[in-house]
Amino acid sequence: NQISKYDPALKLAWFIPRVIIPKKTRGGKDYWIVDVIDDSSQSTKIKCWGVRPGDEIFINRPYVAKLDYDETWGFSCRGVFNFKMIG
C-alpha cells in the first residue's frame, strides 16, 4: 500500500497512526509496526527500526515523518525521532 501524500523527492509523508505493534528482530532488538491511515482513508504499515525505551507515538494524532520507501518492503524509518506531531 502507498501513503497518498508521500513525496518521494523529500521523503516526507503525513498520516495518522492507528495501531502500534511492538516486535523484536531475530537479534532481540525492538521495532514497531505502525498501522497508519492517510487523508484518503488508505491504511499502510510503517516499520520503525531502532525503537528505544521511552519512545512514544500518540494514536489518532496527525504526524509528518521522513520515511524511506522500498518497492519490496514498503515504508520504514530509522527511529521515532523522525515523527513530528502536527496537531
Predicted regions and their residues:
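OB-fold nucleic-acid-binding modules
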Residues: N1-P22, M85
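Short nucleic-acid-contacting surface segments enriched for D/E, G, S/T with interspersed K/R
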Residues: P8-K11, G50-K66
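Flexible loop/turn segments at secondary-structure boundaries
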Residues: V19-K24, S43, T72-G74
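Acidic surface patches and DE-rich sequence motifs
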Residues: K23-G27, D38, D70
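Beta-strand/loop nucleic-acid-binding surfaces
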Residues: G28-I57
